Amino acid sequence: ARCAILVEGDSEYGSFPLFAKKCDIDLDDCGICVIQAGGDSVLQLIQLAEKFGIPCIGIRDSDGDNTPTSIPNLWKTTERDFEAELMKLIDIGREEVLCDILCEYDSEKQERILNAQALNKRAYKKYGYLTAPISTDLKLSDIDKTNITNLKAYYSTWFGINKSQPLGLLIGMKLSKSEIPQIYVNLIEQAKSLC
């Protein structure tokens, strides 16, 4: 490889090759490889690659800390993490894309019940989509499509529970270029410029 893109998780690893393809960038032709580095390893792998003269760029979850990194080729997500980046689709009226992904991936489709404990752990404590803990379970088919709060609570929890390389691959397949979070488009284009 002439350049490496370092990502934190399974979902990013699965989705990035298809994101690149939708940006008209063939990772193989450009000699770009995507490496799943895990959370804290992105920085260390960038530093190691630089010692060997290998151009690379990495992205890690901001986890709510949006201060810029002191390393130019270490980027942070605009939102808290990969799953939160996907929630922007709800904000732009494209919730059906998330529903399509869920229905293809999950055998229970819109009938999947997420328990209150899981929702509170992610949607309330981690993301802050819920303003207070809830005591009831949620099922996607019961959520009004105008209830942005509950949609984000449901989807952020579901994507968090199910994050994996196969889910990332499906996300990469289902999102159009305009639906790919801009931070990832910019990162892939920057990687191409390093080759």
Where are these predicted regions, by residue range?
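Acidic, Mg2+-coordinating catalytic modules of nucleic-acid enzymes
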Residues: 1-6, 10-195
